């Protein structure tokens, strides 16, 4: 949320309240945090939702029920998942129609990717038949290091899924943007990071219309 200049400590209703049934989705949405972008905020309380959901029937579908109420109001609903494969991530995968998988160009990237793809396959088989892997995007890429080059090569050799041509580089301006409460396309629209994300957005949209 820091990317969108929303103070997570000041919002009254968040995704946590939605998941545990203490708020309404329309009340929780923060309108136009950036032009044409709405947000359902979250904060540290979200980590407690996992415990709150224990014992609830069909708890895997709670987020889907929420997004189904608003999906006709938007061109895209983007669910930003935690890196851990917990019940919140399962909820996101059950609610989604497709998954964009970011891979940091680091040593354990391939191992983590294999586990995620296995989880996605299980969710598709048991909870959400419509779920597809939209594509894989490399992030934190540094062309000066052999490690980045090796990760990209290994993933391409071992992965049958679509891989986006656009690669997100390691970029100082990208790292700075959250502290200024802005997405990179506003903070420094001419930076290599901003240009990479624009190209990725175009690639995602173009795949949708093909």
Task: Go through each PLM region and give its residues.
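P-loop NTP-binding core
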Residues: 1-210
